[in-house]
C-alpha cells in the first residue's frame, strides 16, 4: 500500500478508529495486527489490555469476578480505547453484549464484523485453554449458541461484514483496505 493510500484512509471520516468484532477465534487479533501494520496505526487488543491492567489472565478474572466482573472491566477498557484516535482495536467476542459498548464502537469508528462459522471456530479454539466460555462439555454447541445470540448484535454494530470462513488474514486485510477507501 502506498503512503498516499494510507494517508487517505487515515484522514477520511475524521481519523476514525477501526474496530474488529466477532466470536472468539474469528481472527480479530491476527487481522487487526496486519491491518494496523499496513495503515501505520497503533494496534490494541481489549483482552490484552485487560490482562495488562489487572496483571492476571482472563480465566483468573472469570474465576474470581465471574463473567459480570470481566464485562465491567471490558466496558471500561472500551470506553478508554474508543477515546483514542487512529487505532486498530481487536475486541473481545462478548463486547457487543453491552449496548453502551455497541454505541461507542459504532459512533467512534468503523466496525468490521469477522463472521466465521461455529464449526471453523471450534477447530481454531478447541485446544485453547484460555477461553473460559468454552470450558464446557460441548464447546461446539456453546459456539453455536453464542453465534446465534451475538450474530444479530455484531451485524447491528458493523459497518462492514466479512465472511472470514474462506479467507486468510492477508486476504481479509486486502479486502478491508479496498472497502475503507470506498467509505
Curated annotation (Swiss-Prot):
Cofactor(s) named in the record: Mg(2+)
This protein's GO CC annotations: cytosol
Main location: cytoplasm
GO biological process, one term: chorismate biosynthetic process
Entry binding sites for substrate: 47, 71, 93, 150
Residues annotated as binding Mg(2+): 29
MF annotations from Gene Ontology: ATP binding; magnesium ion binding; shikimate kinase activity
Cofactor note: Binds 1 Mg(2+) ion per subunit.
UniProt keyword list: Amino-acid biosynthesis, Aromatic amino acid biosynthesis, ATP-binding, Cytoplasm, Kinase, Magnesium, Metal-binding, Nucleotide-binding, Transferase
Phosphoprotein as UniProt keyword: no
Binding site for ATP: 25-30, 131
Reactions it catalyzes: shikimate + ATP = 3-phosphoshikimate + ADP + H(+)
InterPro entries for the chain: P-loop_NTPase, Shikimate/glucono_kinase, Shikimate_kinase/TSH1, Shikimate_kinase_CS
Family to which this protein belongs: Belongs to the shikimate kinase family.
Record's subunit section: Monomer.
Role this protein plays: Catalyzes the specific phosphorylation of the 3-hydroxyl group of shikimic acid using ATP as a cosubstrate.
This protein's name: Shikimate kinase
Organism: Dechloromonas aromatica (strain RCB)
Gene: aroK
Amino acid at each position: 500500500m502506498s503512503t498516499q493510500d494510507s494517508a487517505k484512509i487515515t484522514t477520511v471520516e475524521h481519523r476514525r478508529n477501526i474496530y474488529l468484532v466477532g466470536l472468539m477465534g474469528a481472527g480479530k487479533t491476527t487481522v487487526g495486527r496486519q491491518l494496523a501494520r499496513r495503515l501505520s496505526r497503533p494496534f490494541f487488543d481489549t483482552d490484552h489490555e485487560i490482562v495488562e491492567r489487572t496483571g492476571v489472565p482472563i480465566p483468573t478474572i472469570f474465576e474470581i469476578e465471574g463473567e459480570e466482573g470481566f464485562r465491567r472491566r471490558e466496558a471500561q477498557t472500551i470506553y478508554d480505547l474508543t477515546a483514542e484516535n487512529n487505532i486498530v482495536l481487536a475486541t473481545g467476542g462478548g463486547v457487543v453484549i453491552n449496548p453502551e459498548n455497541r454505541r461507542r464502537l459504532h459512533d467512534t469508528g468503523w466496525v468490521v464484523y469477522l463472521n466465521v462459522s461455529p464449526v471453523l471456530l471450534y477447530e481454531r479454539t478447541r485446544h485453547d485453554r484460555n477461553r473460559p466460555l468454552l470450558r464446557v462439555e460441548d464447546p461446539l454447541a456453546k459456539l453455536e449458541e453464542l453465534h446465534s445470540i451475538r450474530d444479530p448484535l455484531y451485524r447491528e454494530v458493523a459497518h462492514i461484514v466479512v465472511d472470514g470462513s474462506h479467507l486468510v488474514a492477508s486476504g481479509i486485510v486486502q479486502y478491508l483496505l479496498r472497502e475503507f477507501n470506498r467509505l
